[in-house]
Curated annotation (Swiss-Prot):
Originating species: Homo sapiens
Positions of the cDENN domain: 263-399
Membrane topology, from the record: Single-pass membrane protein
Domain uDENN: 39-244
Chain positions found as N-acetylserine: S2
Modified-residue entries (Phosphoserine), positions: S49, S178, S822, S1068, S1076, S1079
Protein name: DENN domain-containing protein 5B
Subcellular location: Membrane
Protein keywords: Acetylation, Guanine-nucleotide releasing factor, Membrane, Phosphoprotein, Repeat, Transmembrane, Transmembrane helix
GO CC terms, sorted: cytosol; membrane
Pfam families: dDENN (PF03455), DENN (PF02141), PLAT (PF01477), RUN (PF02759), uDENN (PF03456)
Gene Ontology terms, MF aspect: guanyl-nucleotide exchange factor activity; small GTPase binding
Positions of modified residues (Phosphothreonine): T1062
Cross-referenced InterPro entries: cDENN_dom (IPR001194), dDENN_dom (IPR005112), DEN5A/B (IPR047278), DENN_C (IPR043153), PLAT/LH2_dom (IPR001024), PLAT/LH2_dom_sf (IPR036392), PLAT_RAB6IP1 (IPR047277), RUN1_DENND5B (IPR047293)
């Protein structure tokens, strides 16, 4: 909007029409030649009386015939001017004119606006009147026979409420609900419409109402109607940006204004009405749904209400734009578009008296249903709240209250408002002094009903409880006509001011929220062509870094919002601005961000959730007021045209037949508006010719851009102009292609980013996804599956189409199971391992997984159950397999779905399942991490090394399983049983197993290879390697051990058996380390000093990285401390280096023996080491060291010496004492007796280096798992 003219489409610059206020004037109504044609596409019930049916309307005339760059779409305009076709009335019916607007969005995303006034005109064709009477005779014959045949009758008849014997009532009913050609006057709807490039709704409404008033007035208009229509089509220009314009209707001037280049874009729909209709709370919720690109269905009897809410909410999206299907008024013939499996914003007209519960919608799992008339909304499940919602609503409330609008909406005032309106109309009609006929007074009301003063009077009457009696309102209004005119202008100004202030509050939210977005835009391409070519493969926005920089309360909303198409397009526009002119919305937004930085310097790392109110409300309102108080441009007055005399004669109540020859073309070049722009037009023509030379490049760029910007939304808009079966089939093909492409993009994104995350865990890269992002992607996948299963449904049976399908599949399968003798497992048959003990095979069963979900009392809805089942299947790596099994029942699929449904397109379905199968390459915990309170059955198996020890022991063994979410407590293992099952609340990812026994009986020494624990719902199997003895007088004398778990990869039974046996060099971390040092044959496995120091650095570095992740994304700290490459293992290597082994002392010596000798030395000597300045510190360190060691030794646990050393390291790390203890150990005289001179602990430089490394983790708060330090009192 930077230029003086709109830019509605390619080549617009070559035509003067591009700068015109209106492009077409249209007349729609009944074609007398065609007669009455039922509107079959509207799906009307022929049981209704003929007056209640709808009939086909036609475009009777439109001027001009065509504009080259904006061709007239006759079918679409006709459909939207009269969305339900023609309607008929008699003199007893209400015939108030109705105004509504509409929008046509072309496939390239450009928009055209239509403004329609529909009124009723007397039918003069005897042929049509006779046809209507014939229809009534046929209807009455069928209707009354059915009334007397049964006690019920059709819905639109009132006869069911009458007593059959009440003859008088029945006759009244017949009189009301019939048409008699000799007695009744028949009226039919007719529409006049303006098609414009920009949404100047208020101006167009005023112009059309004045035209209607001219038709119904007793006096003919000052000039023929052609003069006014010709004037607005050809002589009224678009106001330039930042300017106001005045042009003339039939009776009064009309004004409009257009925001400047630095202001928010044009919005002429009164937000006041949208807030009054929905209420503030509801509107913010619907606004959030639109931001998250859900399916939004608006529902109202009034077409204009649908447009007002739709346009109002999309206007508030600045700087973003709705990218998907947008049909605020869905014609009755296009109801099949509600089946569209894509995000949409549509408006559906409700029939009078229709209950919401009777409205069958194809899909509701991700639907936001907005019942405008009843002030009611239904939100999807798992709905995140808008950031700072409470403060945001409070700020909006203050603006609304300032303008006298109740934040809760004005639903409760609607009944009294309606009554007051009817009183005013009745008084106007009955007032004999005004000299006007009924229709003229109604049209006057149409001029006044938008008046804020009248509206406030009605609301005040309601609030104060004043009963509005009949009074001569028309007289008082007539006496104050001049004042009323001023009030109307003031009310219009206040609407404009309210609009801009509300929009500023919304825009300020985004400005604050995305003030630093540029810092996270990834611009890797050197030129536009390479960027466009690789658009799908490139990541344009650093989402993980952006989210980690946001306040915690914002994350649920932002993590989903930055995945939307509108945000992706916004970032695309930012990147494209390197090479071409910046998008107008983006330019305004960036300017606002620059302004914020001038007044409030901020850095990306200093984000807060403190709410900052908008500070530009007054300034924005003043700019509007200045434009409306002083007109910048005045258009040419309507004038007499060169018309044939005698044609288009005025006849009250009838819209005349216009002279097409004078309306077909614009004025000659002496028009000052045309001549003024001639130079500009020639310049644009030269630019156009130049652009043709680079047309191929532009075509390529446009092609790539269209593809890049349509990711996940293959179909942008339903085509309204052609409803042939072939076009509908083609549209459904586009839906299917779009769903498949969306599935491919989502699974690829999930796969690449998840694999990237796992590479980080393996030390192969930097993290580029967080758990929050992962959860967002999975929720998005659930939404996609629901849309796929909702596409082409025969009959909807629940809010979740997927769960409904699963239930019906389950019913059929269970019937077959009952018929069979026993169920057959889908997995391989169980085989015994060499050791004789193993986990039994977990049956792979779609039905069993459904039963798990059905047993979860925490989930209350079908949508919730479907999403839980998807998460469980994904975690088990069975999603593709389960869905394939579900769809393999072809008779059921054919019963549930129409032929064009996605699930019945064989090739696309197979590709879809293949894309889902690719997700098996990565591990998800999306079920375990979400449903944290459910009870889960676990199965554990203890695998001993039978060749070296007894499989059966006489002592009493016990086990305790711990996970990220809790532990089981100590559970006794039945004697002589190595396998047990138990149920407890979800433990999350398993981390440790404590295993031990009480050392009773003769056979009390147990050599445990490993412990296996499996989650019986998700199938996740954890292996806890041990490879150590449990028993007194053997190994390190431990009666209990803490085992660190590792998740097993999915494998067959035979592979699992091999994995269960601990290889010689892959036993528990402690075992592996001891073997490498104390084994006489393991010299080659000893790490050298450099490797040990490197191991320490890596272990500490992993802990530091752990704490730099967001809290919710951190893994297990226990593994980093006690795992195979953890801190304990690294320090053990340090302490074992140069340790004098069993060859000298003739027995196994442990690190803990050295620790105890150090303690004994400190407790028996008062000698303080070298530096007297540090006496107090060293005394304190010695005291704490001795205290900790003694506490571990006296703990009521039967832990071995290696286990005690592990506890000491963990406690020293937690309490930040390790850097103080290391120099004490290195300087103690005991070290010379137990360590060789080349040992690392005897090298001062190495010890100092070790201290510095350990000091780097002192800034972190380390919380130890309870199983590690249980029973140790320090």
């Amino acid at each position: 909007m930077s230029g003086s003219c709109a830019a509605p489409g390619p080549g617009s610059g070559s035509s003067p029409a591009a700068c015109r206020f209106a492009h077409y004037f249209v007349l729609c109504g009944i074609d007398a030649d065609s007669g009455l044609e039922p509107d079959e596409l509207a799906g009307e019930n022929f049981d209704q009386s003929p007056l209640r049916r709808t009939f086909k309307s036609k475009v009777l005339a439109h001027y001009p015939q065509n504009i080259e760059w904006n061709p007239f779409d006759q079918d679409a305009v006709n459909m939207l001017c009269m969305p339900k076709g023609l309607s008929f009335r008699t003199q007893t019916d209400n015939k108030d004119p109705q105004f509504h607007s509409f929008i046509i969005t072309r496939e390239d995303g450009s928009r055209t606006y239509g403004f329609v006034l529909t009124f009723y005109e007397e039918v003069t064709s005897k042929q049509i009147c006779t046809a209507m009477q014939t229809l009534y005779q046929m209807h009455n014959a069928e209707h009354y026979s059915s009334v007397y045949a049964s006690s019920s009758c059709s819905m639109d008849s009132l006869a069911s409420s009458l007593d059959e014997g009440d003859t008088t009532s029945l006759l009244k009913l017949q009189r009301y609900n019939s048409y008699d050609i000799s007695r009744d006057t028949l009226y039919v709807s007719k529409s006049i419409c303006l098609i414009t490039p920009l949404p100047f709704m208020q101006a167009c409404k005023k112009f059309l109402i004045q035209l209607y008033k001219a038709v119904t007035s007793q006096q003919p208009p000052p000039l023929p109607l052609e003069s006014y229509i010709h004037n607005i089509l050809y002589e009224v220009p678009l106001p330039p940006p930042g300017r106001s314009l005045k042009f003339y209707g039939v009776y009064e001037p009309v004004i409009c204004q257009r925001p400047g280049p630095s202001e928010l874009p044009l919005s002429d729909y009164p937000l006041r009405e949208a807030f009054e209709l929905l209420g503030l709370e509801n509107l913010v919720q619907v606004f959030t749904c639109v931001l998250l690109e859900m399916q939004i269905l608006l529902y109202s009897q009034d077409y204009q209400r649908l447009m007002t809410v739709a346009e109002g909410i999309t206007t508030l999206l600045f700087p973003f734009q709705w990218q998907h299907v947008y049909v605020p008024i869905l014609p009755a013939s296009l109801l099949h578009f509600l089946d569209a499996p894509v995000p949409y914003l549509m408006g559906l007209q409700s029939k009078e008296g229709t209950d919401r519960s009777k409205l069958e919608l194809p899909q509701e799992a991700n639907l936001c249903f907005v019942d405008i008339d009843n002030h009611f909304i239904e939100l999807p499940e798992e709905f995140p709240q808008f950031p700072n919602k409470v403060d945001f609503i409070q700020e909006l409330s203050e603006v609304l209250v300032q303008f006298g609008i109740p934040p809760e909406g004005s639903l409760h005032c609607s009944e009294s408002t309606s009554k007051l309106k009817n009183m005013v109309l009745k008084d106007l009609v009955n007032d004999k002094k005004n000299g006007n006929v009924c229709t003229n007074n109604i049209s006057m009301y149409e001029l006044l009903k938008g008046n804020e003063t009248i509206a406030r009077l009605q609301a005040l009457a309601k609030r104060t409880g004043v009963a509005v009696e009949k009074m001569d309102l028309s007289a008082s209004l007539g006496e104050k006509d001049k004042d009323l005119k001023l009030h109307c202008e003031e009310a219009e100004l206040r609407d404009y001011q309210l609009n801009v202030q509300l929009r500023e509050v919304f825009a300020n939210r985004f400005t604050q929220m995305f003030a630093d977005y540029e810092a996270f835009v990834i611009q890797t391409a050197q030129d536009m062509e390479s960027w466009l070519t690789n658009r799908e493969q490139m990541q344009n926005f650093d989402k993980a870094s952006f989210l980690s920089d946001q306040p915690e309360p914002y994350l649920p909303f932002l993590s989903r919002f930055i995945e939307t198409q509108m945000f992706a397009t916004f970032i695309d526009n930012k990147i494209m601005s390197q090479w071409e002119e910046k998008d107008p919305l983006l330019r305004v937004f960036d300017t606002r961000i620059d302004k914020i930085r001038l007044y409030n310097v901020r850095a990306p790392t200093l984000r807060t959730s403190i709410y900052q109110k908008c500070s530009t409300l007054k300034e924005a309102a003043q700019s509007i007021e200045q434009r409306l108080m002083k007109m910048d441009h005045t258009a040419i007055h309507p004038h007499l045209l060169d018309m044939k005399i005698g044609q288009g004669k005025y006849e009250q109540g009838f819209f005349p037949k216009l002279q097409s020859d004078v309306l077909a073309t614009g004025p000659t070049s002496n028009n000052r508006w045309v001549s003024r722009s001639a130079t500009a037009q020639r310049r644009k023509e030269r630019l156009r010719q130049h652009s043709e030379h680079v047309g191929l490049d532009n075509d390529l760029r446009e092609k790539y851009m269209q593809e890049a910007r349509s990711l996940g939304k293959n179909l942008r808009q339903p085509k309204l102009s052609d409803l042939s079966p072939a076009v509908i089939a083609q549209t459904n093909c586009k839906f299917v292609e779009g769903l498949l492409k969306e599935c491919r993009m989502k699974t690829k994104r999930m796969l690449v980013e998840k694999m990237g995350h796992e590479a980080v865990e393996l030390g192969h890269g930097e993290a580029n996804i967080t758990g929050l992002e992962e959860n967002t992607l999975i929720a998005s996948l659930c939404d996609l599956l629901e849309r796929i299963w909702s596409h082409g449904l025969q009959v909807k049976q629940g809010k979740s189409a997927l769960w409904s399908h699963l239930i019906q599949f389950q019913d059929r399968e269970e019937k077959q199971e009952h018929l069979a003798e026993s169920p057959v497992a889908l997995g391989p048959e169980r085989r015994k391992s060499d050791s004789g003990v193993m986990l039994p095979t977990l049956r792979v069963s779609l039905i069993q997984d459904m039963r798990h979900i059905q047993n979860m009392s925490e989930i209350k809805t079908d949508v919730g159950r479907a999403r839980a089942w998807i998460r469980l299947s994904l975690e088990k790596k069975l999603l593709s397999q389960h869905l394939k099994q579900l769809l393999s029942n072809q008779p059921l699929t054919k019963k549930l779905y129409k032929r064009y449904a996605f699930l019945r397109c064989e090739e696309e379905r197979e590709q879809f399942l293949y894309h889902l199968l690719s997700l098996n390459a990565v591990d998800y915990f999306c079920f375990t991490s979400v449903f944290t309170t459910i009870m889960i059955p676990y199965r554990s198996v203890i695998i001993p090394i039978k060749k070296l020890s007894n499989a059966i022991i006489t002592s009493n063994p016990w086990i305790c399983v711990s996970g990220e979410l809790g532990d089981t407590g100590v559970m006794q293992i039945p004697k002589n049983l190595l396998e047990m099952t138990f149920e407890c609340q979800n433990l999350g990812k398993l981390t440790t197993v404590q295993i031990g026994h009480d050392n009773s009986g003769l056979l009390a020494k147990w050599l445990v290879d490993c412990v296996m624990v499996r989650n019986e719902i998700t199938g996740h199997t954890y292996r806890f390697p041990c490879g150590r003895w449990l028993g007194k007088g053997i190994d390190d004398g431990s009666l209990e051990r803490i085992l660190i778990g590792e998740l097993m990869t999915s494998a067959s039974d035979e592979d699992l058996v091999k994995q269960c046996r601990t290889p010689p060099q892959q036993k528990s971390p402690t075992t592996a380390r001891r073997l490498s040092i104390t084994s006489l044959t393991g010299k080659n496995n000893k790490p050298n000093a450099g490797q040990i120091q490197e191991g320490i650095g890596e272990a500490v570095n992993n802990i530091v990285k752990h704490f730099h992740k967001p809290e919710k994304e951190r893994g297990s700290l226990t593994v980093l401390l006690c795992g195979e490459n953890g801190l304990v293992a690294a320090l053990e290597q340090v302490f074992h280096h140069g340790f004098k082994s069993a060859r000298i002392f003739h027995k196994n010596v442990f690190i803990w023996d050295f620790i105890e000798k150090v303690v004994a030395y400190f407790e028996t000597t008062d000698q303080i080491l070298d530096n007297e300045d540090d006496v107090l510190i060293q005394k304190s360190s010695c005291k704490t060291f001795c205290h900790y060691v003694n506490a571990i030794n006296t703990a009521p646990r039967n832990i071995g010496k290696d286990g005690k050393f592990q506890i000491l390291v963990c406690l020293g790390t937690r309490d930040r004492l390790l850097p103080q203890w290391i120099p004490l150990l290195a300087e103690c005289p005991a070290i010379t007796r137990m360590y060789e001179e080349s040992a690392l602990l005897r090298d001062r430089m190495t010890v100092n280096s070790l201290i510095r490394i350990l000091q780097t983790i002192q800034d972190f708060t380390i919380v130890l798992e309870g199983s590690l330090i249980k029973g140790v009192d320090v």
